[in-house]
């Protein structure tokens, strides 16, 4: 994983969400996965074999740490994450993880798969579609689509393997009037 990949995740990490634990990047060292969500769009990176992480359990890295590191680093520099440090290339920033429990985002994943031609992006906010397109470009991904089970409350699931960093990438998109847990606002 490179600095440019980390920077693209800032698009889905909120700055001041009342659910303070969402204001950072979730890292599960044991499962070697990274997730970020603002409650309407979720990005999950799995099978990060080439990700250089050294820690145990889970950590939530504050957004401002990721912003600071990715704004001054070489976008092609490798990322290294521990329970208390984030490094991109030669730059290392110590951080204090956000206390709290990251939500169990897997409970909202739809199960059925559909082709791109049969998918319906039209009922999503255009800024969400732009975020997906940007992440797909940054990670070099062709997505497979899993349609919402219920267009009113279920998320759309997109999955693909990055040919740029060999991560398995999952993105969930929810309509604006529904949060990531499927609850209407």
Located regions from the model:
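DNA polymerase processivity clamps
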Residues: 1-185
């Amino acid at each position: 994983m490179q600095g440019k990949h980390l920077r693209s995740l800032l698009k889905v990490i909120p700055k001041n969400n009342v659910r303070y634990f969402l204001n950072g990047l979730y890292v599960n060292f044991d499962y070697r996965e990274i997730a970020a969500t603002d409650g309407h769009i979720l990005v999950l990176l799995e099978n990060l074999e080439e990700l250089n992480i050294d820690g145990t359990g889970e950590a939530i890295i504050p957004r401002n740490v990721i912003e600071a590191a990715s704004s001054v680093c070489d976008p092609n520099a490798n990322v290294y994450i521990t329970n208390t440090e984030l490094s991109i290339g030669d730059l290392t920033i110590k951080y204090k993880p956000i206390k709290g429990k990251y939500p169990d985002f897997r409970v909202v994943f739809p199960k059925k798969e559909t082709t791109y031609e049969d998918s319906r992006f039209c009922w999503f906010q255009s800024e969400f579609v732009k975020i997906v397109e940007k992440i797909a470009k940054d990670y070099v991904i062709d997505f497979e689509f899993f349609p919402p089970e219920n267009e009113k409350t279920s998320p759309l699931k997109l999955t693909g393997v990055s040919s740029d960093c060999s991560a398995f990438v999952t993105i969930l998109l929810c309509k604006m009037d529904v949060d990531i847990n499927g609850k209407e606002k």
